[in-house]
Amino acid sequence: MARVKRAMHARKKHKKILKLAKGYYGRRSRTFKNANETVLRAMNFAYVGRKLKKRDFRRLWIARINAAARMNGLSYSKFMNGIKLAGINMNRKMLSEIAINDEKAFADLVEVAKKQLNA
């Protein structure tokens, strides 16, 4: 069987992982095995966190829209149904920004939604 020489590749891999583990406490930043486990775990947490961030922001936008809509006498679900019926195609992020920064414009949107629900 032929001899496999892989020192350069292994060193490159180890250096890459140890560089990623810089700043970790104790042996986690100095030995390849511990650093590798910690880096893989950290990358997994980062991956999951990127998915959770999308959910968290959507929940925040809905809570803001709901609060602003209720201040104008309409629940979130009725407000969203009303603007859909009115043909206003605006995402929740934009609606929440309008609710925070321009209360008069949001009140106008609520009035449009109310008219569509009553029609």
Swiss-Prot record:
GO biological processes: ribosomal large subunit assembly; translation
Question: What Pfam families is this protein classified in?
Answer: Ribosomal_L20 (PF00453)
Keyword Ribosomal protein listed? The answer is: yes
User: Could you tell me one molecular function GO term of this UniProt entry?
Assistant: rRNA binding
Q: Which InterPro entries match?
A: Ribosomal_bL20, RIBOSOMAL_L20_CS, Ribosomal_protein_bL20_C
SUPFAM superfamilies recorded: Ribosomal protein L20 (SSF74731)
Q: What does the UniProt keyword field contain?
A: Ribonucleoprotein, Ribosomal protein, RNA-binding, rRNA-binding
Q: Does the keyword Isomerase apply?
A: no
Question: What GO cellular component is one of the record's annotations?
Answer: ribosome
> What exactly does this protein do?
Binds directly to 23S ribosomal RNA and is necessary for the in vitro assembly process of the 50S ribosomal subunit. It is not involved in the protein synthesizing functions of that subunit.
The similarity annotation says: Belongs to the bacterial ribosomal protein bL20 family.
For this entry, the protein name equals: Large ribosomal subunit protein bL20
- Give the source species: Clostridium novyi (strain NT)
Q: Which gene encodes it?
A: rplT
